Amino acid sequence: MDSSYLRISLSFLFWALLLSPAVSQSSSCSSQTFSGVKSYPHCLDLPDLKAILHYSYDASNTTLAVVFSAPPSKPGGWIAWAINPKSTGMAGSQALVASKDPSTGVASVTTLNIVSYSSLVPSKLSFDVWDVKAEEAANDGGALRIFAKVKVPADLAASGKVNQVWQVGPGVSNGRIQAHDFSGPNLNSVGSLDLTGTTPGVPVSGGGGAGNSRIHKRNIHGILNAVSWGLLFPIGAMIARYMRIFESADPAWFYLHVSCQFSAYVIGVAGWATGLKLGSESKGIQYNTHRNIGICLFSIATLQMFAMLLRPRKDHKFRFVWNIYHHGVGYSILILGIINVFKGLSILNPKHTYKTAYIAVIGTLGGITLLLEVVTWVIVLKRKSAKSTKPLKA
């Protein structure tokens, strides 16, 4: 009995010792200490990106001292902590960005006055900062730390709160930080910081709701456009191309084609409108290629809809010209639509299964198209052969 108890005790001790290093690597407010520097009475385990903020505030001179800690999204990446004096997002914020020099391994801090996402170059902040430095946190999973003192603007000091933004990214190339992910945690990493620390139980407010709403709108935008430009338009084109070859399908194929394309257009316009709305709400975030293709798609698809009103009769002399125009614009919409769906997927960066599923759907439609193309040509050639072998009437 005693030996059995001893074996159980030793086994428990073994597993406890084995797991203890992993537990110690999980950083939090209570586990972080700083040697040789001042103490920070307030600390927040921020809700996203495994970030931690230690801070103190001297109301007599409106000085905010901070230590921001977070692991970069990839080894060799960067971290950033910022105050936005006017808004709640990254655009317009005054940022401190830390990264390690790849050749020396020394961590340093760069300041960025982020006017827009397309212009991320080192620049002076709109308020004073000093005692700025960066370091790699020992035994903290590759996390970086930013130390700084900030002169809080008078209007923010009077309110007792500042809008803080934090972020992590994959790397630095030629002195420029590489774009961070646009997934949920990266969009939710904003909030309000109580300078006095009197409300530690609610460290962040207003960030998650705004981020979740934006993600929801992006998802709606993506679904609408994938269904319209990326699915219904190709199916509508296939109906017109391959059903009309069967004489019994006339004029049913025409009404099916029009119904499918009109539905695709209506859904596509809704998706285009949500894209414009997202653009207006995301100051400084620009996806020029995706945006320009979207505008082009809306424009030529609208022309295609109006062209149906000017469709000449089959025996009209301009019907041939109209057919060339209609087919050319239609295939342009088809190609641009599929390209822009993939552009959108790369921006949304959803789970890999979504992109795989769309590729599978498009691949299936492509396979069906090849099969129907062969069938169509066989039918056409047989009809021509039958006509050529018919005896001429006397």
Curated annotation (Swiss-Prot):
Q: Please classify the protein's predominant subcellular localization into one broad category.
A: membrane
Q: Which cofactor does it need?
A: heme b
Q: State its location(s).
A: Membrane
Per the database record, which ranges form the DOMON domain? 49-169
InterPro entries in the cross-refs: AIR12_DOMON, Cyt_b561/ferric_Rdtase_TM, DOMON_domain, UCP037471
Q: Name one Pfam family in it.
A: DUF568
A single GO CC term for this protein reads: cytosol
Q: Does the keyword Ion transport apply?
A: no
What are the binding positions for heme b 1 in this chain?
Answer: H221, H290
Q: Where is the Cytochrome b561 domain?
A: 184-381
Amino-acid positions noted as binding heme b 2 in the UniProt annotation, renumbered to this chain: H257, H326
Write out the transmembrane intervals. 220-240, 252-272, 292-312, 328-348, 361-381
* Any one GO molecular-function label of the UniProt entry: metal ion binding
Top-level taxon of the source organism: Eukaryota
Function, as annotated, reads: May act as a catecholamine-responsive trans-membrane electron transporter.
Q: What is known of its domains?
A: DOMON domain could bind catecholamines and thereby could regulate the cytochrome b561 domain function. DOMON domain could bind one heme b.
Q: What is this protein called?
A: Cytochrome b561 and DOMON domain-containing protein At4g12980
What is the organism of origin for this protein?
A: Arabidopsis thaliana (Mouse-ear cress)
